[in-house]
A protein has these predicted regions:
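Aromatic- and charge-enriched surface segment that lines or borders ligand/interaction sites
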Residues: 1-43, 77, 167, 215-217
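Ligand-binding "clamshell"
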Residues: 185-198
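Gly/Pro-rich hinge or "lid" segments in bacterial periplasmic/extracellular proteins
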Residues: 63-66, 80-148, 152
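Surface-exposed binding/hinge segments that line
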Residues: 8-10, 27-29, 36, 45-103
Length: 237
């Protein structure tokens, strides 16, 4: 809407969760209510707190987020309590991922741990997880878009840098992030320099004023701090 308070989303048809359930507007409704549920104590509830009625649910004063309206199976309308410029950008972040109602309700405490109930809509699905050791993903063959070109991914966790480097150089790892401490070693090595890949990682960094602080609640102080920031230097760091 022109006042920046109302957003209407038309969902793509045929997008399926890994349990075969189609993603529908009801899943969006369920997700937002679940994220704001006081009992869930979700650390990512801030993603939706600007939606009308969300803070009331988080405070235990209401059962449902009033600003979420299901129009039909593939259309949902979200109404905000106040204009929030980064709203659309925040919805693209991982904490705003949509849950499948059936998987969460049937899985209970197993959701997030058991592959049967931990489902998404991506081109890779959860196969198994050995806590603090590894996570295995496999290709989703009925993915709604172009399928992955590899059959799966194995993530190894909690490997110290020296062991990780040795495994990579022995061909036991296909990919390894490097930091500045070993960058020069690889970039100057004829064997490895052509295998280095530089890329821009999509991210959004920002500074936020805590307006619960009486000083930061004053617009003059916020403007003064904003004007004092050297944007050119800030953007280069």
């Amino acid at each position: 809407s022109k006042d920046g308070l109302k957003f209407t989303f038309h969902q793509r048809k045929g997008v399926k969760f890994h349990n075969g359930e189609e993603l529908k507007a009801d899943d969006v409704l369920f997700t937002i209510n679940k994220m704001m549920d006081k009992k869930a104590a979700n650390i990512n509830s801030y993603q939706f707190e600007m939606i009308k009625g969300a803070k009331e649910v988080l405070a235990g004063k209401a059962d449902k987020v009033s600003g979420v309206k299901v129009i039909d199976d593939y259309t949902v309308e979200l109404t905000l309590s106040y204009p929030y410029a980064p709203f659309l950008a925040s919805l693209t972040s991982a904490p705003a991922s949509i849950f499948n109602r059936k998987a969460v309700e049937e899985g209970g405490d197993k959701f997030g741990f058991d592959p049967e109930y931990t489902v998404g809509t991506g081109y890779m699905k959860f196969k198994d997880w050995t806590q603090d050791k590894e996570i295995n993903l496999v290709r989703t063959d009925d993915y709604f878009n172009d399928p992955a070109k590899i059959s799966g991914v194995r993530y190894l966790m909690n490997i110290d840098k020296s062991t990780r480097r040795m495994m990579f150089e022995n061909g036991e790892l296909d990919y390894m992030p490097i930091d500045k401490t070993i960058y020069d070693t690889y970039v100057n090595d004829p064997l490895w320099k052509d295998n280095l890949i530089k890329f821009l990682a999509p991210s959004m960094d920002y500074l936020i004023f805590n307006q619960n602080d009486p000083n930061m609640a004053k617009v003059d102080i916020r403007q003064a701090v904003t004007k004092a920031i050297n944007r050119e230097v800030f953007n280069q760091t």
